[in-house]
Amino acid sequence: MSTLPDIDQFRKEARVWLEQNAEPLPEINEAEEEDQEVVWGEGSDNVAIFHNFTDEEELARLNAVKAWQAKKFDAGYAMINWPEELGGRGLPASYVRAYMAEERKFKIPSAGELPPTSMGLIAPTVAAFGTPEQKEKWCKPIMRMDICGCQLFSEPSAGSDLASLTTRAVRDGDEWVLNGQKVWTSGARFSEWGLAITRSDFDVPKHKGLTAFMVPFDWKGVEVRPIKQMSGGANFNEVFLTDARIPDEFRLGPVGEGWRVALTCLGFERDHSSSSSSSHTGGSFKQVVAAARW
């Protein structure tokens, strides 16, 4: 006999909670919206993929998301399908979908790039490879957005071929000395931690010599620099690691298993992208299509 709560009752309770904590969105007649034509010169012509917020505006948006996520976490809706031993409710993914179907009807703070990366990629990767102490240290704080984490994967000469990365990790007792540069890192300026894939062994095939670390951004030898876009914003960052001494307790997964950690994280990224609705920062999808045809 199933011990799962009735999903319709679960959805009803979620709706009640949302009504008490968020503003409902106006109902949209999708048929009428579909019939509307794009008229040049009317409305916004912004079809940008990336936003152009100032750091102050970006931080204000992030703080709004953090406040919402803390509410959501405390009410039990942030880790619905996470295992109970990690602080979740242990429910199937169908309950997540049921909750999200209700949440989409409400005005929720816009997440931007960092929160989905932090909660959808970094936290589950820690859950997959972390020690009990690491899971306790990072999973729930990330899912409540008390802290944020980003990916430190790409390098100037290692983008699509990630396994060719050269950021070096050399063991020195109970520490690792990291040296190298990461690039195109979304959200690094507002993150407390970064999941870095490094090369710890140059004498084995490139996929086998990688090791993963959780790198604290307030650490000596860790520097974050924004990459300014021509449009004025700075969605991406460079992260420089210069003799950054990282404790072995921050290593995620076994030595030499960084490739497996990276693939797992990228797998979560694909899952997250496929389950999310198509969206971008600028105008409607119809505007993008119209601009492409113009």
Question: What is the meaning of each model-derived region?
Answer:
Residues 157-160, 184-187, 202-204, 228-235:
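Short Gly/Pro-enriched turn/cap motifs at secondary-structure boundaries
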Residues 5, 222-294:
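Glycine-rich beta->alpha junctions and the first turn(s) of the following alpha-helix
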Residues 1-117, 134-137, 141, 148, ...:
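Amphipathic, small/basic residue-rich leader segments at the start of a protein or domain
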Residues 114-133, 159:
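N-terminal glycine-rich flavin-associated loop
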Residues 76, 99-105, 197-198, 214-220, ...:
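Short Ser/Thr-interspersed hydrophobic loop/turn segments at strand-loop and sheet-helix junctions
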Residues 167-170:
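A structural signal for short hydrophobic beta-strand segments in well-ordered beta-sheet cores
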Residues 145-153:
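A short, Trp-centered hydrophobic/proline-enriched beta-strand micro-motif
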Residues 175, 179-225:
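A short core secondary-structure module
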